Amino acid sequence: MGLEAVLTRRSDRGGVAMELAVTIPTLILVLLAVLEVVVIARTQLELVAAAREGARVAATVADPARAVTAVENALAPVLSDRVRVTVTRPAVVGRAATVVVSLRHRMVTPLLRWLEVDLRGRAVMRVER
């Protein structure tokens, strides 16, 4: 092994550590961003499913309070305390009953706890009775 090879090898010693020092935090940030997107998507799907359940009840029962109860029962306990439910049900059969479930979602990641996103699920069904 020549002198030139030894000098080249010594100058590359901290390269891998430096690359890891830059790459690992970047990967962690990307993983946290993916986690946030998944949590938001899951919450959005839950809101839509709960609104659909509330609209089913609103389409068959004249009492809006029963539709609100159906929405709260369809949601996870963590979400049911924080949602706002709006039920619009006309008295005329054949018209559309609308249920809107909304929530201000706070991010899960500690670095983004200050950030909130408005999520909303909406369902419309024809009044049957």
Task: Describe each PLM feature range.
Residues 2-4, 60, 64-129:
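Short, conserved structural patches
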Residues 1-70:
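Alpha-helical assembly-interface signal, strongest on the long, hydrophobic N-terminal helix that forms
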